[in-house]
Each structure stands twice: as structure tokens, then as C-alpha cells.
Curated annotation (Swiss-Prot):
Similarity comment: family membership: Belongs to the CcmE/CycJ family.
One MF annotation (Gene Ontology) recorded for this entry: heme binding
Organism: Methylorubrum populi (strain ATCC BAA-705 / NCIMB 13946 / BJ001)
Membrane topology field: Single-pass type II membrane protein
Keyword set, alphabetical order: Cell inner membrane, Cell membrane, Cytochrome c-type biogenesis, Heme, Iron, Membrane, Metal-binding, Signal-anchor, Transmembrane, Transmembrane helix
Principal localisation: membrane
Region described as Disordered: 135-169
UniProt-recorded name of the protein: Cytochrome c-type biogenesis protein CcmE
Compositional bias ranges of the Basic and acidic residues kind: 145-154
Gene Ontology biological process terms in this record: cytochrome complex assembly
Coiled coil: none
Spans within the Periplasmic topological domain: 29-169
Compartments (UniProt record): Cell inner membrane
Length: 169
């Protein structure tokens, strides 16, 4: 075997090993990749039941219904479409109507999104990038952030507060 053919075989073997490693990495990650969709995309694209994804938008005013055993039903909207959501568990402290949220779960055959987790925005100006991009694409984005904080929202601790104190809920 010539030197050139040995080098070519070595390069081909390294390429095959890299391709195999990349294939294994992608197959391992396929179960953990979750796509983001807005309510308008869910309505227009016809997401198959059982598909896992993240749903982002605003909690529709007047849609929150609390049931027994921490069951909560609400609707998520992007002003173009609305998706009903069912969730069982404790909601974040910042969850409220008109609030930007991202919920992760699956869509059932009846078009109801069954959420496993619900995340609320962190402060008055925070909006998940995917939600902001979807609102911008639909021409619904308003510069300057969100709404004012509600009167019952937690206030930041004063500068002279000691570390030992706990906030009351």
C-alpha cells in the first residue's frame, strides 16, 4: 500500500467515526428537543395529537378556572388564536390573566393542550424570546415592555433589609 492510499483510508475511517458519533448524539437528543409554537401556529398548522411542544402566549382574561386537586384550566392567546390549556399542579407566583407564559406539554385529540409545566415571565419587561418573535411576526408587538405591575405584586426588598428576613407570601 502506498503512503497516499493509507492516508486516504485513515481520513475515510475518521470521517466514518465522526459521522457515527454525530448520528448517535442526534438520536440521543431527539427525545429532548421540544419545539415552540404560538396559538396561531397550533391552529393553522394542525399539530398532530400527542406531539410534545411548548406553547407560548398570554393568559386570556377571564379564562382561568381553578378546580379541585390543583386542576387549573385557562386559555393561551396571541390575539389571533386561542388554545385551551389544562394543567395540574402549582402555578408560578407570577401567573395571572394577561400574563406572558410558556407551557410545555402535548395536544390531545380534542384540541386541548395538556401542560406538564407552566412558566411565567420574571418581571414586567421580560417576555420569552419566542413569544416576542411570534408577536412581532403578527404585528402585535408593542415596544416598551409589558403592563404595569399589579398592586398586589411583591415589591423588591429595601436596601437596608437583612439577609435573615423572609418574605411573606
Amino acid at each position: 500500500m502506498t503512503r497516499k492510499s493509507r492516508r486516504l483510508i485513515l481520513i475515510a475511517a475518521c470521517g466514518a467515526v465522526l459521522a457515527l458519533a454525530l448520528g448517535l448524539i442526534l438520536s440521543a437528543m431527539s427525545g429532548s428537543i421540544v419545539f415552540f409554537r404560538s396559538p396561531a401556529e397550533v391552529a393553522s398548522q394542525g399539530v398532530p395529537p400527542g406531539t410534545r411542544f411548548r406553547l407560548g402566549g398570554l393568559v386570556k382574561d377571564g379564562s382561568v378556572k381553578r378546580g379541585p386537586d390543583q386542576n387549573v384550566e385557562f386559555s393561551v392567546t396571541d390575539t389571533n388564536a386561542t388554545v385551551p390549556v389544562q394543567y395540574r399542579g402549582l402555578l408560578p407566583d407570577l401567573f395571572r390573566e394577561g400574563q406572558g407564559i410558556v407551557a410545555e406539554g402535548t395536544l390531545d385529540a380534542g384540541g386541548v393542550f395538556r401542560a406538564d409545566t407552566v412558566l411565567a415571565k420574571h418581571d414586567e419587561n421580560y417576555m420569552p424570546r419566542e413569544v416576542a418573535d411570534a408577536l412581532k411576526a403578527q404585528g402585535r408587538w408593542q415596544e416598551g415592555g409589558g403592563k404595569e405591575a399589579p398592586k398586589d405584586a411583591a415589591k423588591p426588598a429595601s436596601a437596608d433589609a437583612t439577609l435573615g428576613q423572609r418574605s411573606e407570601r
